[in-house]
Amino acid sequence: MKSPIFAALTLAIASAFPSVAMAQSNEELLKELRALRDRVNQLEERLKASEAKPAAAAAAPATAQWGMTPQQAQDFNRIAVKTEALEDSTEALGLKNLKISGYMDPSYIYNRNQNRAGFQFLNNVENGGYHYDNSYIGTVALDLLKETEGGTRWHLTLSPNRGTDAVIGNGSVIQEASVSIPLGDLQTRMIAGHMPDWSGYEMLQPTLNKLVTHNLLFDFTLPTAYTGAGLELTRGKWITKAVLANMNSSMQPAGEKSPVIAYRVDYSKGEFDGFGFAGVHGKAANGVGGTGSTMLNLFEVDGYYIRGDWTLQGQVSYGGQKQASITPNPDSGALRNSEWMGFSGLAAYKFSPRFETIARFDYLKNSKNGGGLLGFGADPRNGIGPTMTGRDADTGDLLFGDTERGANRTALALGINYLYDLNTTFKLEYRYDRADRSVFELVKDGSFSKSNNLLGASVVVKF
């Protein structure tokens, strides 16, 4: 049976071209009609194929979707929904880009001259003050660092009893409370708040300090913290920070209006070494009572080389303050200027990835006008001041020999570190302190010595 479409086309062609049909032979006409029929059949086949594709596509997910089974596709969709909900919740709670870390270092200290030995942890700095045998030893800290979408950083570190704010006399748990705000780009920032001092090669945190104790320059010649505002600039390998701030004071007392300028410049020469320098210039409180704030100038240069198993670090410092010497002029009684200079060097070598030995040597020259360091007067526990001969029987005040010359100090520390795991380090240190004057008090019998011995141990745990 012939196709009705074929018959209709035959009649149409015959009607439209009667003269051509008569001129052509029957055989030629049949060839043309067969060709036309084949073409029509091809069009019909293509139409059927196009109608069958949507049905096949609709049935495909029942068997597979993107190379997954239906169950796998359902699990994937469920995970995607939960992930989006978790991201929304994290952002709503303020936890996005929030880093929480912390550390603690329960310690044991033996001090020969103080006739003291025992564990040391979270002792209040108000009970006995700041000394080289307690400083930031036996602390705990919680660190919160939050960065917003725009690049602003909010930094809060809490450390009870022995934080920087407690050391400067406020008694709070604040160690750092600062903000860093980008100005135009992330390499130019405004910094403000309460910031620990950044001078020297040694860091405040026990996680970044190889020994249990700190060097002489860290303890006696550097500021504790700044409260103020300034800029931080990053330009290639250079990082510069400068602030206009109160030094060691969260608020200026009545009658004081002059802040200090504090700055720090670091240069990373390469992967293994670098150097930096820091300074403080301006009026600050001194260790002589009743003088108020006087002009202070501090400057130090430090550097490091860390490659393979070796670590080398060093620092040279100079400082001086007006009317801050321990002893006044013997003739006029007028207060005189204090001045000091010193250096510290540290070398460490790892015999294995876990086992490290450390040696540190410090020297501090402080002989001018009976001595006097940053915030320190005569101190028989720290070994600062002129020759000490005893104490007054009635008042207990120190008695001095030659008051014109203060003691120069040295300290040698030898230590061992053992990295128990990625978060735990055991430290052991022996330290020998010496002075060229009798400035260390032996509390057992009340005599004075030129030297002291200290043994310290701690376990530093961080997360």
Give the location of each predicted region:
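Generic alpha-helical hydrophobic packing signal
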Residues: E28-E32, E44, G151-T152, L186-R189, ...
